[in-house]
């Protein structure tokens, strides 16, 4: 896979490839085009049971399916397969788990649509299983409401350097593409200017917003943030946490829509005292999702 993608090999063969799998009969890894060997990853499934894998591997195929698989191959290949099936229950391998998990029609389309992005620096990126199932859990949370009509939120804990910013981009893409959340706006809150700039660049590079949208998304002052919250229609807003202190003093800084998702970066260190209170006052029914690299 990696060798054939090189410039002097057959890189054009991979131009339309979304997921790449490397298997050897027992094990399997996945990645996408241009992924360095050290970043090829194992997949750990959370929605398919081991019993399902076993049933699928040991289900006998009807004759028409066997013909499609083996008629163009030497007869001994078909005989070997039939001998394996007749020999008793086959043991499920990591290769089996990878193939069933990622190449189901619904999962493959989901991975392509929601969990693949292009980054100007890192290239094409496909989500790790932790990101996929973490985002799925978040989506389940934010599509539910509490007794006051506010969306439920949650916390995502990432180890340092494991792709927290990309998880935020994947989540934002899901909010854009999923019909049930298509009306939602996203407010990205950080506590440092350099983090705000970094996240804005990552969102733009990852396709969650255009360069023009990036400029409009920045809450450059507390007054600008108040206008964006109360009167704006930007799909994504970026703000430093302390701008809420100024914004909340302005009458337009209020929006009680439940269709606002607040993503708080470094949530472990910025949500004490008045910081969180000001956000809750401005956006009382929003879903609040904290991201942190600090163990909880």
What is the meaning of each model-derived region?
Residues 150, 182-183, 231-234, 256-258, ...:
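Short loop/turn elements that form and flank the Walker-type P-loop nucleotide-binding site
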Residues 1-185, 194, 198-210, 233, ...:
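ATP-dependent helicase/translocase motor core
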Residues 2-3, 32-33, 40-43, 245-251, ...:
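Signature of the SF2 helicase/ATPase Hel1-core->accessory helical subdomain module
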Residues 98, 124-128, 162, 189, ...:
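Hydrophobic alpha-helical scaffolding
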């Amino acid at each position: 896979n990696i060798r054939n993608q090189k410039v002097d090999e057959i890189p054009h063969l991979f131009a339309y490839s979304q997921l790449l799998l490397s298997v050897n009969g027992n094990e399997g890894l996945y990645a996408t085009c241009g992924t360095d060997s050290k970043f090829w990853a194992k997949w750990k499934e959370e929605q398919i049971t081991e019993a399902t894998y076993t049933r699928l591997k040991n289900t006998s195929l009807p004759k028409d399916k066997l013909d499609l698989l083996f008629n163009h191959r030497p007869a001994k290949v078909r005989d070997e397969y039939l001998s394996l099936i007749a020999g008793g229950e086959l043991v499920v391998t990591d290769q089996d788990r990878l193939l069933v998990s990622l190449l189901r029609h619904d999962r493959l389309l989901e991975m392509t649509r929601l969990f693949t992005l292009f980054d100007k620096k890192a290239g094409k990126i496909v989500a790790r299983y932790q990101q996929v199932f973490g985002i799925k859990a978040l989506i389940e949370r934010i599509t539910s409401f509490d007794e006051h009509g506010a969306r439920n939120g949650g916390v995502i804990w990432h180890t340092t350097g494991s792709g927290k910013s990309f998880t935020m981009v994947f989540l934002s893409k899901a909010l854009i593409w999923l019909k049930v959340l298509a009306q939602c706006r996203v407010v990205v809150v950080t506590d440092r200017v350099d983090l705000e700039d970094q996240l804005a660049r990552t969102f733009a590079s990852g396709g969650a917003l255009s360069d023009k949208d990036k400029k409009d998304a920045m809450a450059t002052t507390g007054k600008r943030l108040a206008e964006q919250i109360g009167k704006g229609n930007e799909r994504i807003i970026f703000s430093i946490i302390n701008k809420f202190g100024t914004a909340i003093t302005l009458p337009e800084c209020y929006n009680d829509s439940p269709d606002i998702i607040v993503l708080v970066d470094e949530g472990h260190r910025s949500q004490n005292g008045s910081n969180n209170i000001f956000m809750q006052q401005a956006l009382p029914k929003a879903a609040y999702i904290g991201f942190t690299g600090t163990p909880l």
